[in-house]
């Protein structure tokens, strides 16, 4: 078995310029989510079987592609096999892409208090490379396609050094500091005319 190649289960799509590996248990809705993302203008790389290899030009990255036999096809429960090139045009399918983010469709309990702020974030090891992974709760009524798009945009900002949770915590800290300073140095009381009250001078 090659140590620089791996065939993995799931759906591989290009979203917002990022290569996203959708994983989860059988029946989790990976292919349906992939189809919805394609309908929103994103591109399918592979469904069901994804061939990952280490990028020869940059060993720190992985490249994912579809086996030639399955190129452009997706299997959706209730619809069967669909040819996306026929349905959405050649631009809906991409030959290969770098793997940037893994998203696991998760049917576990609700996120903890900390996870509500930070998200369920970890890494998954693929051929010795740690790939950022987000676990998205799968619930009735959730628009997973929108969540995946938002996750990709947020991932780009994080890669550039911005973290929304850290930003909010810093903003709250600044607000508390300002409140404490205002309490320690109260403003002079105002008169009925709106001007500060001057101390009474005795003759």
Where are these regions (language model features)?
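Conserved nucleotide-sensing/catalytic segment adjacent to the nucleotide-binding pocket
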Residues: 43-104
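Glycine-rich phosphate-binding P-loop
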Residues: 16-44
């Amino acid at each position: 078995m090659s140590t620089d190649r791996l065939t993995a289960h799931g759906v591989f799509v290009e979203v917002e310029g990022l290569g996203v590996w959708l994983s989860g248990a059988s029946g989790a809705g990976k292919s349906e989510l992939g189809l919805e993302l394609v309908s929103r203008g994103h591109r399918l790389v592979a469904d069901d079987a994804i061939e990952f290899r280490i990028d020869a030009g940059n060993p720190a990255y992985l490249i994912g592609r579809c086996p030639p036999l399955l190129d452009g096809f997706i299997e959706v429960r209730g619809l069967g096999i669909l040819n996306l090139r026929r349905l959405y045009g050649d631009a809906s399918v991409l030959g290969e892409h770098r793997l940037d983010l893994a998203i696991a469709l998760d049917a576990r309990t609700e996120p903890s208090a900390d996870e509500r702020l930070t998200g369920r974030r970890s890494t998954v090891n693929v051929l010795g490379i740690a790939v950022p992974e987000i676990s998205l709760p799968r619930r009735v009524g959730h628009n997973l396609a929108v969540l995946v798009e938002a996750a990709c945009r947020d991932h780009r900002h994080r890669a550039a050094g911005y973290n929304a949770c850290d930003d909010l915590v810093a903003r709250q800290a600044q607000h508390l500091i300002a409140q404490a300073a205002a309490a320690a140095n109260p403003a002079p009381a105002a008169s009925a005319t709106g001007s500060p009250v001057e101390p009474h001078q005795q003759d």
